[in-house]
Structures are given as structure tokens and as C-alpha cells.
Amino acid sequence: MHISTIKTAGSSGMSHMNEAYSSTTATEMVARGAGSEIIHTEIDSNGSKELAPNGAQSRVQKPSEDAVRAPYDYIRTLPSKRIRETFIDALDSWLAVPAGSSTSIKSIIGMLHQSSLMLDDIEDDSTLRRGKPTAHTLFGTAQTINSANWVFVCAFEELRQLRGVDAATVFVEELKNLHCGQALDLHWKHHTYIPSVDEYLNMVDHKTGGLFRLCVRLMQGESSTSCHHIDAERFITLLGRYFQIRDDYQNLVSDEYTNQKGFCEDLDEGKISLPLIYCLAGSDPTQIMIKGILQHKRTGEMPLSMKKLILEKMRSGGALNATISLLKDLQDDILEELKSLELAFGSGNPMLELVLRRLWI
């Protein structure tokens, strides 16, 4: 069938309208004043729309998605521990989210995570992701950005499957938080600004905590239990901090991270990580020297000798020990908060505790 809409045209527009009206079996008109011209929108039998300007025979066919999704499909094939999916399953033992909603939330969180990885690798100028070439080195920077943006839209499309009345609001709030946190991280790197530990933690609460909060808030909105209102924000905040600080630490000392991303890759990208903040918390000659290295670093890998020098200063100056000490404190705080949640929900959650303990350093 034909559906007619209106666009502004010349003085003969009304005759076009009348002709369209008389020749169209089903017509929907949106009047915008005198002087208008018809554009026909055809809906075929399977519901897809094709545009035929001014009733012309040519139609705009739906484009293939092969190119736009190629970088996304590639990064999905890379090895993953699927921690976020397991985290959702563990929380579900408390929140009893309907199966369809749980599947949608996993899909939404997964798409947002993969999209952020593609963009992070571009912003960090990374060449390796989980031991494989990053998406933008294979498909090009522009195509990878476009694919990541498309995936964000797909995630919002999947959001419409949820029943929670506040789902869209929650989605927008936490994505704004995530991008604001990422902006701080990029700003500090660009200007070689060394933030305080409190500033750093605030950034992490937005950048890393945002996706965890989104996950929990969406699940609470879909929960079929009377416990959906229980406040888990402190638990999620601590978990987000642990994830990010653990990543900072492992990037410098883990052989697995070296194999997957390269030796001390955070130094290559100029990232202002927590160990680096601890290392530069002063103004002795060594700290001034390291700041100078960071300020004059150019795009690309930092020389291996410089990375080894900075890593040694982190060890000898106590920065790595301070980082691992904070991680141990966070582990204790997270387990304590887990016990509080178990009391609030009225049941234990051994699956969630197992997920957490697998992350411990």
C-alpha cells in the first residue's frame, strides 16, 4: 500500500496533493500549509519501507549490513572470559528476571562492552586486543568508529524489548556517565595531568562503574521479586573500582596481559593509571624525569628501555605495593558488602562470590 507524506514545494503543490489522494488506496497526510508535494513511502508485504520520491519507480532498498557490522563481528570472535554474562546470571538468582528480559540485558551489555572496546582501542592507539590485531588496524579507523556507533544504536533498539518504564532513562544516564568518565581519562592523558587518587576514583566510578550500574538497574527494573528496590550501589561502585585498578596493575606486571596487549601497554598509550599516580606523587628528581618522559612522548610505542625504567621506579618507590594493597582492601570491602546484600535479599549467593574470587589477585 502507499502512504503519502508532505514536503514543502511550489505553488502547484495542492494539485499534486489532490492527484496523490485520488490515486492512493490508503493515504496519511500531514498538512504543513499551502504549497506541498507528495513523497510516497511504500511498505511491502514483509513490512520493510522503500522510498519512491514523487511517486517515481526507483526505490531506496535497505542496504546490506555486512560492512557496518564487520568490525563488531570480528571483535566478538576474540577470546573472552564472559565475566559480565556470568555476573548477570549470578545476580539473577536474587532478582529473578524473566528469561526474555535477561537475554535482552545480556545482549545490551555485551553490545555496549564490545562497542566501547573498539573505541577504546582507537583512542588508546592500541594494536593488540586479547592477543589479536585490534579492529581498527584491520578495518580502518573510520569504519570501526562507524561500526561502534551502529552497535550503540542496536543496543538501544534491543532496549525496547524490556518492560521497565525507566529503562530508556537508565540507559541514557549511565551512558552519559560512562562517556564523561572516559573524557576525563582522555583529558588527563592528553595534557599529562596527574590527578589525585580521589579524582581518579571518581573517574573510575563513571567510566567503569557506569556499565555495571546500567546492568544492575536494568535488571532491577525487570525483576519479578519484591527485593528489586534493594540498594546495591556501593557494591557496584566497589566492584567497578576493583575491575579498573586490577586492570591497571595487571597491565604492568601480568605475563598474560603482556601476551595479549604487549609489555606495559598502558605506558605506550600514555595512560594515567593508579600505579603511575602513586609513582608521581611527589617532586623528587626521578618523578620529574618520568613526568618529562610522559610529556614528550609521541604517538606509538614507548622505547622498551624507558618502560623498564619507569616500571622499576614504580617497584622501588612503592607504587606497585600501594596498588596491590588497595586491591586487597577492596577485596575485603566487596566481600563485606556482599554479606550485607545477602542479608537484605534473605539468601546467599555462592555463584556471585565465586565470580568475585576468580578475579582476586
UniProtKB/Swiss-Prot annotation:
Xref: SUPFAM superfamilies: Terpenoid synthases (SSF48576)
Binding site for Mg(2+) 2: D120, D124
InterPro entries documented for this protein: Isoprenoid_synthase_dom_sf (IPR008949), Polyprenyl_synt (IPR000092), Polyprenyl_synt_CS (IPR033749)
EC number: 2.5.1.-, 2.5.1.1, 2.5.1.29, 2.5.1.10
Region described as Disordered: 44-63
Cofactor(s), by name: Mg(2+)
Binding site residues for isopentenyl diphosphate: K81, R84, H113, R130
Keywords, comma-separated and alphabetical: Magnesium, Metal-binding, Transferase
CDD domains on file: Trans_IPPS_HT
Reactions mediated catalytically: isopentenyl diphosphate + dimethylallyl diphosphate = (2E)-geranyl diphosphate + diphosphate; isopentenyl diphosphate + (2E)-geranyl diphosphate = (2E,6E)-farnesyl diphosphate + diphosphate; isopentenyl diphosphate + (2E,6E)-farnesyl diphosphate = (2E,6E,10E)-geranylgeranyl diphosphate + diphosphate
One Pfam family this sequence matches: polyprenyl_synt
Cofactor note: Binds 3 Mg(2+) ions per subunit.
Residues where Mg(2+) 3 binds: D247
Superkingdom of origin: Eukaryota
Protein's GO biological process: alcohol biosynthetic process; isoprenoid biosynthetic process; mycotoxin biosynthetic process
Residues involved in Mg(2+) 1 binding: D120, D124
GO MF term list: (2E,6E)-farnesyl diphosphate synthase activity; dimethylallyltranstransferase activity; geranylgeranyl diphosphate synthase activity; metal ion binding
Keyword Transport in annotation: no
Chain residues that bind dimethylallyl diphosphate: R129, K207, T208, Q244, N251, K261, K271
Record flagged with keyword Membrane: no
Family, similarity comment: Belongs to the FPP/GGPP synthase family.
Function: Geranylgeranyl pyrophosphate synthase; part of the gene cluster 25 that mediates the biosynthesis of an isoprenoid secondary metabolite.
Protein name per Swiss-Prot or TrEMBL: Geranylgeranyl pyrophosphate synthase 3
Organism: Zymoseptoria tritici (strain CBS 115943 / IPO323)
